[in-house]
Amino acid sequence: MKIKEIIVVEGKDDTVAIKRAVDADTIETNGSAIGDHVIEQVKLALQKRGVIIFTDPDYPGERIRKIISDKVPGCKHAFLPKEEALAKRKKGVGIEHASNESIRRALENIHEEMEAYTSEISWSDLVDAGLVGGEMAKSRRERMGKLLKIGYTNAKQLHKRLQMFQVSKESFAEAYKQVIQEERK
């Protein structure tokens, strides 16, 4: 599988994992202290070939994704479910621990940022679905993020991603229905 866009990852081990799974070029941020030279590389890559941000499904990875998204709007995003990024001995989370199949699947389901889009899904829809507050909220958001392939987030970030990736009310309702069915099992 050849990827046209340049993939932004956190480090060398992620690059090795990406290249093991697909034919692609990467830019490494080397941690969350992203220098101006990395931002310039990402801007140039976006102009020339497009960019996919593919960071670890953990707090530092999400922080890096947000920094790059804010400074270089228009990037695409790939998300890896946390359970597919766990190290063998459960010590650590990262793309470098994912299988080739998981990496390919994440890159087949990329999302594009859309600016100035008003979501069909309101904050009260999230509250009504039990995705904000309450004992089941976190697990429901985890499941929704996985089903919609937008990654796990807190409630505020979930609302933002639903808008950014223009998730339709139908897709949201379908995923929610599936979450509720799974809870009843």
From Swiss-Prot:
Positions that bind Mg(2+) 2: 56, 58
Disulfide bonds: none
Top-rank taxon, per record: Bacteria
Entry's Gene Ontology BP terms: rRNA processing
GO CC annotation terms, alphabetical: cytoplasm
Stored InterPro entries: RNase_M5 (IPR004466), RNase_M5_C (IPR025156), TOPRIM_dom (IPR006171), TOPRIM_RNase_M5-like (IPR034141)
Primary localization: cytoplasm
Positions annotated to bind Mg(2+) 1: 10, 56
Subcellular location: Cytoplasm
Ranges of residues in domain Toprim: 4-87
Record HAMAP family: RNase_M5
Function statement: Required for correct processing of both the 5' and 3' ends of 5S rRNA precursor. Cleaves both sides of a double-stranded region yielding mature 5S rRNA in one step.
Protein name: Ribonuclease M5
Source organism of the structure: Bacillus anthracis
Organism placement in taxonomy: Bacteria, Bacillati, Bacillota, Bacilli, Bacillales
